[in-house]
C-alpha cells in the first residue's frame, strides 16, 4: 500500500517536472528519388564526382610554398585515397543492398509489392487453408472396407482389412 502511494507521488512529481512541455516536432523524412535504384545510382555518382573535384582542387593548394614541408604533404597524400575508398565502399554497399539479385531479396520484394498474394501460409497462392478446402482426390473416394473411405496411404486406419 505504501509502495503504491509512493509510485503515485513519483508520477505526480514527474508530471509537474515535465510541466506539459510539448515534444519536439518530428523531423520530416527524406523522400527517395522517384526513379528508384537508377536515380540513386546517379545521385551517388554525382556525389562522388563532387568529392573528387573537391579533392582535386584542394590538392595543389595544400602543397604550399615548397621547401621543407614535403614531409607534411607526403603524409597528407595517403589520407585522400582512404577517404575516397571509404566513400566508394559506402556507395557500393548501398547499391548492393538495393540490388534484388538473390532469391531472398527478390522474394522479400515480391511480398512487399504484392501482399495480397502472400497473405497466408502454405503453398499454392492464397491463405493458409487453401489446401484444406479442396476435396479429396477421386481415387481416395472409393469405398474401402465396410464402405468407409480409405486414408491417403490406401490402408484402413485401425480396421486391418
From Swiss-Prot:
<dbReference type="GO" id="GO:0008217">
    <property type="term" value="P:regulation of blood pressure"/>
</dbReference>
<dbReference type="GO" id="GO:0042311">
    <property type="term" value="P:vasodilation"/>
</dbReference>
<keyword id="KW-1015">Disulfide bond</keyword>
<keyword id="KW-0382">Hypotensive agent</keyword>
<dbReference type="GO" id="GO:0006182">
    <property type="term" value="P:cGMP biosynthetic process"/>
</dbReference>
<feature type="region of interest" description="Disordered">
    <location>
        <begin position="19"/>
        <end position="135"/>
    </location>
</feature>
<feature type="disulfide bond">
    <location>
        <begin position="145"/>
        <end position="161"/>
    </location>
</feature>
<feature type="compositionally biased region" description="Basic and acidic residues">
    <location>
        <begin position="94"/>
        <end position="104"/>
    </location>
</feature>
<comment type="function">
    <text>Snake venom natriuretic peptide that has a vasorelaxant activity in rat aortic strips and a diuretic potency in anesthetized rats. May act by activating natriuretic receptors (NPR1 and/or NPR2).</text>
</comment>
<dbReference type="Pfam" id="PF00212">
    <property type="entry name" value="ANP"/>
</dbReference>
<keyword id="KW-0800">Toxin</keyword>
<dbReference type="GO" id="GO:0005576">
    <property type="term" value="C:extracellular region"/>
</dbReference>
<dbReference type="GO" id="GO:0005179">
    <property type="term" value="F:hormone activity"/>
</dbReference>
<feature type="propeptide">
    <location>
        <begin position="23"/>
        <end position="139"/>
    </location>
</feature>
<dbReference type="GO" id="GO:0090729">
    <property type="term" value="F:toxin activity"/>
</dbReference>
<keyword id="KW-0732">Signal</keyword>
<dbReference type="InterPro" id="IPR030480">
    <property type="entry name" value="Natr_peptide_CS"/>
</dbReference>
<keyword id="KW-0840">Vasodilator</keyword>
<keyword id="KW-0964">Secreted</keyword>
<keyword id="KW-0838">Vasoactive</keyword>
<protein>
    <recommendedName>
        <fullName>C-type natriuretic peptide</fullName>
    </recommendedName>
</protein>
<feature type="compositionally biased region" description="Gly residues">
    <location>
        <begin position="120"/>
        <end position="130"/>
    </location>
</feature>
<feature type="signal peptide">
    <location>
        <begin position="1"/>
        <end position="22"/>
    </location>
</feature>
<feature type="compositionally biased region" description="Low complexity">
    <location>
        <begin position="29"/>
        <end position="60"/>
    </location>
</feature>
<feature type="compositionally biased region" description="Low complexity">
    <location>
        <begin position="76"/>
        <end position="93"/>
    </location>
</feature>
<dbReference type="GO" id="GO:0007168">
    <property type="term" value="P:receptor guanylyl cyclase signaling pathway"/>
</dbReference>
<dbReference type="InterPro" id="IPR000663">
    <property type="entry name" value="Natr_peptide"/>
</dbReference>
<comment type="similarity">
    <text>Belongs to the natriuretic peptide family.</text>
</comment>
<keyword id="KW-0165">Cleavage on pair of basic residues</keyword>
